[in-house]
Amino acid sequence: MNCLYQRDCLRLLDFTTAELKHIITLSEKLKKTKQNRQEIKLLKQKNIALIFEKESTRTRCSFEVAAFDQGANVTYLGPGSTHLGTKESIEDTARVLSRLYDGIQYRGHNHKTIEILAQYSTVPVWNGLTEKFHPTQLIADLLTIKEIFPNRNFSDIKCAYVGDSRNNIGNSLLEAASIVGLNLYLVSPKQYWPEKNLFIECKKIIKKNQGNIICTENISEGVKNADFIYTDVWVSMGEHHKIWKERIELLKNYQVNDSMIKMTNNSKVKILHCLPALHDQKTSIGKSILKKYGLKDGMEITDNIFQKHQKTIFEQAENRLHTIKALLVSSLIKEMNF
C-alpha cells in the first residue's frame, strides 16, 4: 500500500527523507505526463475543500488546476465564507467537511488552526500556508533545485537564504534542508534568525543526511560559492507599518543585487523567489512601499537581478502545480501503479 495514503501535510517534518524524495520523484513524473498530454485522471470522484482565510494566487491556482487535471472537484471557501472559529468551532468544521470531502486544504493566519483541523478531520489536511510554515512551496523549490542539478546530491548543493529567516519560508526551508541534506546558509541579522528549538531540531536531523545548516549575519560568508540565493518579501500586508520600517531598515543590506551576486564567486548562481516580489513599482503596493521608504530599485531584490533570473523564478512558480498534484495523488490514492 502507498505509505503516504491518507497522510496530512502540515509541515515538512511530517515526512521522512524517503517520503519527501518520493513526492519529488512523483512530481517529476506528473509534470512529464502533463507536458506530453498523457495525464491519467487518478482522482475521479474525489472532492476537495479549499479553505482560504488568506487570499492567494499561486497556491489556489495550483490546487485547483492540480485537482481538475486529475479529475477531482473542488469547493473554494474564501475569506469570510465559512464560520470557521467564529460561528462554528474548528473541531466541528473539520467533522462536517470530513463527511463531504476527501481532503481539505487550509491557508490561514494561525498554524494552531490547521493542527486542530487535522486532529478532528478523518481525511487528509494540507497546509497551503500558515504564519509558521509553507510546506507546499518548499516541495516545489526542491523540485526546482533537482531539475537544475539532476545529477547532484542535495548534500553537494549550497543554498543561501537571505532576508527574514524566521518567517514561514525560512522555517520550511530549514525543515526541507534537514530532511534532504541540503547545505543551507541562513543569512540574516540575528534578530531574524530561526526560532531556537526548531533550529536545534533540524540541526540534529541534518547530521544524518550529510548536509549542514549555518546562520550568519555575514553576507559575503553566507553567499560565497552558493549555487542558489533564495529570497522572499520582507513585509506582509497584514503587519503594522511600524514593523515595516524597522524590518526594512535592518534588512536593506540583505537585498539581492549585483554586489551580492559578485560575492558568490559563481557566475552561474541561480536565484529563487517564492513570489510575489517587490522588485519594481508596477503594483500599487510596490510603488507605495518603495517610495515611502526611499528604496529606489526594488526591496528584497533589484529589478535587474529579478529579470535576469525570471526563467528560474517562474519555473519555480509552475512547479507549485506539479508538486501539489503529487501531494494530492500520494495522499488520496491507496494503491499506486504509476
UniProtKB/Swiss-Prot annotation:
Its main location: cytoplasm. The keyword tRNA processing does not apply. It is an enzyme of class 2 (transferase). Pathway: Amino-acid biosynthesis; L-arginine biosynthesis; L-arginine from L-ornithine and carbamoyl phosphate: step 1/3. Carbamoyl phosphate binds at S56, T57, R58, T59, R107, H134, P135, T136, Q137, C274, L275, R320. One of its GO terms (cellular component) is cytoplasm. L-ornithine binds at N168, D232, S236, M237. One of its GO terms (biological process) is arginine biosynthetic process via ornithine. GO terms for molecular function: amino acid binding; ornithine carbamoyltransferase activity. It comes from the Bacteria. Gene3D superfamilies: Aspartate/ornithine carbamoyltransferase. It holds the Pfam family OTCace. The keyword Iron does not apply. It is found in: Cytoplasm. Keywords: Amino-acid biosynthesis, Arginine biosynthesis, Cytoplasm, Transferase. Disulfide bonds: none annotated. It catalyses: carbamoyl phosphate + L-ornithine = L-citrulline + phosphate + H(+). InterPro entries: Asp/Orn_carbamoyltranf_P-bd, Asp/Orn_carbamoylTrfase, Asp/Orn_carbamoylTrfase_sf, Asp_carbamoyltransf_Asp/Orn-bd, Orn/put_carbamltrans, OTCase_ArgI. Its EC number is 2.1.3.3. Belongs to the aspartate/ornithine carbamoyltransferase superfamily. OTCase family. Reversibly catalyzes the transfer of the carbamoyl group from carbamoyl phosphate (CP) to the N(epsilon) atom of ornithine (ORN) to produce L-citrulline. This is Ornithine carbamoyltransferase. It comes from Buchnera aphidicola subsp. Schizaphis graminum (strain Sg).
